[in-house]
Amino acid sequence: MKTLKINFLLVLIILISGCSSVPKNTADGCSIFNERYMWYKHAKKAEKKWGTPVYLQLAIIKMESSFDWLAKPPRQKLFKVVPYKRPSSSFGYSQAVKGTWKQYKEETGNKLAVRTRFKDSVDFIGWYTNKTEKILKVSKKDAFKQYIAYHEGWGNYKNYKNNKKVINLAKRVEKQSNIYKQQLSLSLIHI
């Protein structure tokens, strides 16, 4: 009986770790979807529902979490040594903070959504970019400004020109978005 329990736990651990590992080549959209076909289905569903291009969804996730389902911001340090609290409640693929995630769940009725599930994360990104387009009049095809709104929030968006760090991050997202767009247009998947 004890052996059966141990074997069950080993199989469970292998299954969980196999399903949640980071794709081998996150720089290539085609490679990501060839490795994770269901991710393609989920991203396309979010694109159809919200109008957010798949390549923008991927670029935001790459910047926010590097496709790590358990990603969290690094802990702050006390006296540059002692681990302390995290700077925000960001978590999962989308790095959504608790308050915004709660708002997403309430507004969409997706009460069972979790930040560690790719399906829910791309739907969240679609919802967020859709609201950004409505609130700030930023096109979903404008990766640069969409990412600034995503990173800074709708209220702080207007102040981004004074924040060189955010501008540089947004430029990287824009560049990665264009790379994914080109890759996916040439891919056998045909997005």
Give, region by region, the residue ranges found by the protein language model.
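C-terminal motif of bacterial Sec signal peptides marking the signal peptidase cleavage site
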Residues: 17-18
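Bacterial N-terminal signal peptides that target proteins for export
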Residues: 1-8
